[in-house]
Amino acid sequence: MDMNVKKKKLGLKEKYAHMTRGLDWQTSYQPMEKVFPQATFEGIKIHDWDKWEDPFRLTMDAYWKYQSEKEKKLYAIIDAFAQNNGHLNVSDARYINAIKLFLCGISPLEYAAHRGFARVGREFPGVGTRVACLMQSLDEIRHAQTQIHSLSNYNKFYNGFHNPTDMIQRVWYLSVPRSFFDDALSAGPFEFITSIGFSFEYVLTNLLFVPFVSGAAYNGDMGTMTFGFSAQSDEARHMTLGLECIKFMLEQDPANVPIVQRWIDKWTWRGYRVLTLVGMMMDYMLPKRVMSWKEAWEVYFEQNGGALFNDLARYGIRPPKWLDQISFDKDHISHQAWATFYQYAHASAFHTWLPNDEEMDWLSAKYPTTFDKYYRPRFTHWREMADKGERFYNNTLPMLCQVCQIPMVFTEPDDPSKICYRESDYEGEKYHTCSDGCKQIFDDEPEKYVQAWLPVHQIYQGNCFKPGTDPTVPGFDPLAAVLEYYNFGPGDNMDYVGSPDEANWLKWKGLAKEDPAKKAA
């Protein structure tokens, strides 16, 4: 009689090979270079795709089982947060403006990353890289969805949450993070992996998620904290994918080293410029602060990133360019950014305010060499104007950097009293950039950056009005027309003091008896 012999259970490596077998076939109807044309045009030389392996070896059956368990826990907490009026447990309604910025500026980028990884997963010939990109693509769309679901409860009670998908395409300050991803998505697959998988996910992700998630926890926002921690296990895989791809390219051919080095220089600088918004949030938008932007940069980039680049030195990779500029900027950029948003609060979908005396003392302690000298006098002057009923709004439009698209507000590395301007000439036209880093990036690829969609230029050209708008009619208000195009509603913009958000918060917390609409008016 035949005996049933129990089959040996496959190990993780064997199971991964079994589940992904057949994905790396050699084409016969068309040559491989026609099926994967993007794999060679950047100049990266790959001799053996089998040398790259996914260290997590995650298969689809394991992925869905693992993620479904996380989703159950996440949505249970989100439901409990909503049912128990969790929005009233945050430290102060000013904090809500930080997550308005997150929803409009970061969550759409998660969806853009989903699209990007789905695309490059098709463009890589190597099966291991394709499967890893597929998993990350799924992660990114899940992150976008869970962030929107977690923050949707706030949309019932606060202004400015209603239309992030239109805002990311139209609003002036959101062109900063959007241009970063537009730049990455219009690059080849290897540069995309370097920009998102390495520079952003590996080098800079802690500076994005740790301040937001820790800040949320410290300010009583359990919904934001929960989706942040839920995403952290995914981020570990994303960081590994980025680092493994970098090492894979460097190990395949020495000719890849200068190409990868240029990408690391470019995308570290571009990512750092995007994180200006995070620095502003850390220093000014959290009523209860976790750490300063300067401290976060020193811990998560200078120390952790320094160790990473020491490891990559054996491949011939040096630390990114312009670190001396960044070392100077870390004492300034958050203050310069907040001063800019304070002036343009009438054109922003979140509220701004001036730091009080206690908060300015905290900033003075964290930035002892710069805040009292350069920024406290400015804020004090604006407070005196506001006390007289002359709250300052800047009604002009600023020059924008052609690369990072941030207004030209940053100062020279050796002179904090002088605005940094750089110029480049291309085909008879002048283009302006905000720093040596952005100028070098422009000069390397001018044909790409001359096509940048700059919001200020578009406003002056009349492209930021709704169809049918006639700018020639008597009494035409261009700002009102632009805000209508942005789809801003009453109460989305202007100063926090006197806003419907402040009035409602005071009423809900029993701190004021006035009618919110009357008080806001």
What are these regions, as identified by a protein language model?
Residues M1-W52, N256-K388:
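Extended, helix-rich structural scaffolds rather than catalytic motifs
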Residues R21, T27, D92-F124, A187-Y218, ...:
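Alpha-helical bundle segments that constitute or directly flank the non-heme di-iron/ferroxidase center
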Residues W25, Y29-A80, I141-P164, L243-C245:
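Conserved alpha-helical segments that form or flank metal/cofactor-binding pockets of metalloenzymes
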Residues F81-F102, N163-S199, A217-N219, I264-K288:
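Acidic/His metal-coordination segments adjacent to aromatic residues that form catalytic metal sites
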Residues L101-P177:
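Long, hydrophobic, well-ordered secondary-structure blocks that form the structural core
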Residues R119-V131, Y154-Y158, A184-G188, V210-S230, ...:
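Inter-helical turn/loop segments and adjacent helix faces that build the functional surface
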Residues D357-E358, W362-K430, E447-A521:
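Intrinsically disordered, low-complexity terminal tails and linkers in eukaryotic proteins, enriched
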Residues M408, C438, F442:
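Cys/His-rich microdomains that often coordinate metals
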